[in-house]
Amino acid sequence: RKGGVFSFFEIEGKAAHSGGNFEAGVSAIEELARKVQALHAITDLKRGITVNVGLVSGGQSVNTVAPYATGQIDLRYVERPDRDEAMGRIHEVIGRSFVPGTRAKLTIRG
C-alpha cells in the first residue's frame, strides 16, 4: 500500500492590465504552469513515486495578468526514503522562481 502526502501551494505575482500595461505584470499562472511541469517530472513509476497536481486555480479576470494562483499536490510513494527524496524535490520546485518576480509558499496538509 502506498503512503501519501497532500500539500497546497500559493503563488504571488503582480497584476497588470493585459492590454495596456502587460509588461508591468508578473503572471502567477505562468509560474504555476511551469511548476506543474516540474512537479510532474518527479514521478518515477518504476519506484512507485507519483506526483500529481490535481487541482489548480488562479487569476482574477481574463484581461488581467494573474496576480495569484494555487495548486494542490498529491504525492504517493512506497518506501519512506522515497517520500523524503520526493518531498525535497517538491520543496525545491516550489522554492524556485521560474518567472522572475513571483513568490511561492508550500503548506503540507497531511
Short names for language-model regions:
Residues 5-110:
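Metal-dependent amide/peptide-bond hydrolase catalytic core
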Residues 1-2:
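Acidic/histidine-rich catalytic neighborhood of metal-dependent amide-processing enzymes
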